[in-house]
UniProtKB/Swiss-Prot annotation:
One Gene Ontology cellular component annotation held by this UniProt entry: mitochondrial crista
Disruption phenotype: Leads to decreased vegetative growth on several carbon sources including maltose, citrate and acetate.
Organism: Candida albicans (strain SC5314 / ATCC MYA-2876) (Yeast)
Topology relative to the membrane: Peripheral membrane protein
Signal peptide limits: none
UniProt keyword annotations, A-Z: Electron transport, Membrane, Mitochondrion, Mitochondrion inner membrane, Respiratory chain, Transit peptide, Transport
Induction or repression: Expression is induced by interaction with host macrophages. Expression is repressed by nitric oxide. Expression is also decreased in stationary phase. Expression is repressed by HAP43.
Domain of life: Eukaryota
PANTHER family according to UniProt: CYTOCHROME B-C1 COMPLEX SUBUNIT 2, MITOCHONDRIAL (PTHR11851:SF209), METALLOPROTEASE (PTHR11851)
Keyword Transmembrane helix listed: no
Main location: mitochondrion
General remark: Has antigenic properties. Elicits a specific immune response in systemic candidiasis human patients undergoing malignant hematological disorders.
Family: Belongs to the peptidase M16 family. UQCRC2/QCR2 subfamily.
Protein name, as recorded: Cytochrome b-c1 complex subunit 2, mitochondrial
Amino acid sequence: MLSRASIRAYSSIPNSVKIAAKESATDLTKLSVIINNAGSKTGKSGVSHLLSKFTFLNNGAKSALRFTRESELLGGTFESKVTRDALILNTTFLKQDLPYYVEALGNVVSNTQFAPHEFNEIVLPTANAETKLANANPAFKGVEKLHEITFRRGLGNPLFYNESTPIKLEEVAQFSKEQFSGENISIVAEGANEEDLTKFVSESAFCYLPSSSSNGAKALPTNTFTGQEARVPSSGASSALIGIPVKPADFGKYEVLSAAIGTSTLPSTSTPLAQIPGATSHLYKYQDAGLFVISVSGEASQVAQGIKQAKSVAESVSSSALSEAVKAAELSVALQSTVDSPLNVKVVAEEAPISKFNYVAVGDLDVLPYADEL
């Protein structure tokens, strides 16, 4: 199912930058620049995260302070985020300010200065703080470890920068130069006229980007592994997670299974996992593969019992329960589909095996079970 918020067709300018837009009845425009092959799965571990912290800093056209103040006066918002597939720049603003933000985003991707003082005083501290905050959550640490043991490299790379893998400023700048090419960039907007958007993009710094880069880093082939286990000692709350690698063609099956047992996207008190404290499921979807995760978080003894119960729940879902969950799965997919990450997943009520899985325990390892004890 394709969300109503998603956009089907792209036009392009001569350097292969892809453009798509749909109009809306509101006065707001959501404009996103998606740089594919610039996510955490590509290049050195952490370099994409550091690059995301350089966006909206000083560039050849204007300073970060000037852009921030101008955006505040216009009432707009902006952010950058890194996913495993891409680096994404998001802006939201009033419709009449579309030319300003197209110009600003064009300068971000084509003209960032990569100043040494910004790297040391802003980029590294901000990235380290985000990494520390994320790793304070045992469920996040568990999901990261599940990706690592399931995919190893590529999609198994950590989402965020870690000081254990040193990265120089020159490496971030080079990664930007290699990945910020027209063939990798899609510009999508909700609440904008596509003809106007294409005109503004063609008049902006986006047109200075090369069509392609022969030296660009390529994502590694996606290999998956099962039967793996990892145990991570951690203070505070505990988390136990089961992960099943999923082919893109099977996304629909696992979305239905997730809806049937209880999904984090569409919480419901009537699902089986809702009866287990701290339990939920989610299908992480990427361009080349996915990872279906069943997790339980909370106090260690509750997690130890809960993960066993959650696994049993997933193994015992009936065909009738899957059929009844189709509509909920369609709604869940629609809720996950956004302007910057549109989904095209056809849900189907078919068996979604979980027999071949990976397992991660985070927290009090004296209490949390091993995989063969589930």
